[in-house]
């Protein structure tokens, strides 16, 4: 598709050539060995760390005309939902936690991945391309587990860009904190934002 559309001149305009790519690992389809959707089984697509029938389904890619600084790029694939202060973890109708203690201790916030892709515009100027694809806030029941996860996946970026709120954040390499106050950034992706 890339070569049939993006890199082909269209409507009298020159073709766009993306020399740099970033393809992160994603949580969709990665088996958790837990019954995360409470259907009595542990091997369905709803039991993966992110809904998916196979690892990598619904993955994402960043295409860039500018160099990607892979050394400074960060991923948050394994950040645990419980580690977000005030996390909106779902509850049953009787106010008991929806997820068991074991499930909560292993449940990742990101249904795909959250990535801070550092793109170098000039030798002295770069910006942070903050990409994610939160779970749709539907396909659940009264516990609203997907709606709550979607909320916190979007909230993650709000905290990440706010130095006073990002101290709890850790990336997949164990580095803590978010952006500094003077960082340039763009938030992008299919956020599936719930208007309610």
Model segments located where?
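Extracellular/periplasmic catalytic domains that process cell-envelope and extracellular macromolecules
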Residues: 12-16, 53-57, 108-111, 120-124, ...
């Amino acid at each position: 598709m890339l070569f049939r559309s993006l890199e082909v001149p269209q409507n009298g305009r020159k073709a766009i050539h993306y020399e740099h790519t970033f393809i992160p690992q994603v949580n969709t389809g990665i088996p958790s060995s837990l019954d995360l959707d409470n259907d009595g089984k542990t091997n369905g697509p709803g039991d993966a760390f992110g809904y998916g029938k196979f690892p990598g389904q619904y993955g994402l890619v960043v295409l860039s005309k500018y160099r990607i600084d892979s050394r400074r790029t960060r991923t948050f694939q394994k950040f645990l939902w419980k580690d977000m202060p005030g996390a909106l973890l779902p509850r049953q109708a009787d106010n008991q936690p929806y997820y068991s203690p074991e499930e909560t201790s292993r449940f990742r916030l990101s249904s795909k991945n959250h990535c801070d892709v550092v793109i170098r515009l000039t030798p002295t100027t770069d910006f942070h391309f903050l990409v994610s694809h939160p779970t749709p806030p539907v396909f659940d029941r009264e516990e609203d587990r997907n709606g709550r996860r979607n909320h916190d996946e979007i909230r993650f970026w709000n905290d990440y860009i706010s130095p006073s709120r990002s101290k709890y954040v850790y990336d997949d390499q164990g580095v803590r904190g978010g952006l500094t106050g003077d960082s340039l950034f763009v938030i992008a992706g299919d956020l599936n934002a719930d208007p309610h």
